[in-house]
Structures are given as structure tokens and as C-alpha cells.
Amino acid sequence: MKSVYPMSSPSSAVFADQGLSGKANQTQPPPPLGLVVPASKPGAKKPLRKNAWQVAPNLLVSFRYAWAGVSYAFATQRNFRIHTFTGVAVITAASLLHLEAIAVAVLALTSCLVMILELLNTALESVVDLTVGQSYHELAKIAKDCAAGAVLLAAIAAVIVGGCLLLPPLLSLMV
């Protein structure tokens, strides 16, 4: 007799198989597609999280998972790297121009907002790709376009804020 005990979503279900003994032999759900290569192949990678469908056991592990997401975005997403380097350049310029702490904080927050939205965009694109696979769906396009639009609007706002806070001191240096 087989039964499925859903945890939070179909992809995070625990599958139990009760044999003649009546004891449940729990097996874990299959790993997400594209993350695991058979170990027999050279250069095979182990999954980042063996039990990815489980909640992190402690806060340190949660931080490690979060940092893995940031590292993944930095390694794979060109736009995330551009936003990161731009943010560092803006904060460096603000420090060199001796801007007030509140101005530096506003610049840091707007830069971080763009990077946060880029992380959310990457996550949403991954989930949409996992859901629709290689097929085209108009709703998938809308979801991806809206997420990219959110990043675009945040980037435009960051440029405006950066211009308002950095241009006056830069212009005063040129005069």
C-alpha cells in the first residue's frame, strides 16, 4: 500500500511504502532535474543540498543556503554581476566624495534593492523554467517579463537616486 504525505508542495512530498510488516520505508523524492549527474560520470557533482525539500536545521545552515543563492547568481547571472560592481563603484565614489552617512545609506539601499530584485528575478525564472520546461507558454513569458520589468524599474530609480546624490559633489569638484 503506497501513500503520499504532502509537506508543503507536491515537489516536497515524502513517499512512504508500507510493506507486509506495516512499517513505513520512507524514501526521499527524486532530486530536481538538472542538479544531479549520475555519480558514474566523470566530473559528476553532488547536489548542493541532499535534502533540499527539508527545512534547514539551524540558523547557520539557513545562512549557508542563502549565501549559496547569492553565489549562484553571481556566478551565473551577468546582470547580477553588473549590478554588484555598479553598487560597489557607487558606494566607493560616495565614500571618496565624503558624502553624509544618510546619503551613503540611501545609495547602499537602492543598490541592494536592485540586487535583491535580480535575485528574485533569477529565482522566478528558474521556477518558471522548471514548470514549463522546454515548451512555450504565454503566462510563463508574462511572469518572466514582469520580474525583469521590476528589476528595470529599480535600476532606473537607482540611477536617478545616484545622480541626485553624486552629481552635485562631482560638479563642485570640476568647478
Swiss-Prot record:
PROSITE patterns for this protein: DAGK_PROKAR
Membrane-crossing residue ranges in chain numbering: 55-75, 96-116, 151-171
Record's subcellular location: Cell membrane
Residues annotated for a divalent metal cation binding in this entry: 125
Keyword terms: ATP-binding, Cell membrane, Kinase, Lipid biosynthesis, Lipid metabolism, Magnesium, Membrane, Metal-binding, Nucleotide-binding, Phospholipid biosynthesis, Phospholipid metabolism, Transferase, Transmembrane, Transmembrane helix
A GO term for molecular function: ATP binding
EC number: 2.7.1.107
Pfam families: DAGK_prokar
Membrane topology classification: Multi-pass membrane protein
Primary location class: membrane
Function: Catalyzes the ATP-dependent phosphorylation of sn-l,2-diacylglycerol (DAG) to phosphatidic acid.
Protein name per the record: Diacylglycerol kinase
Taxonomic placement: Bacteria, Bacillati, Cyanobacteriota, Cyanophyceae, Synechococcales
Encoding gene, per UniProt annotation: dgkA
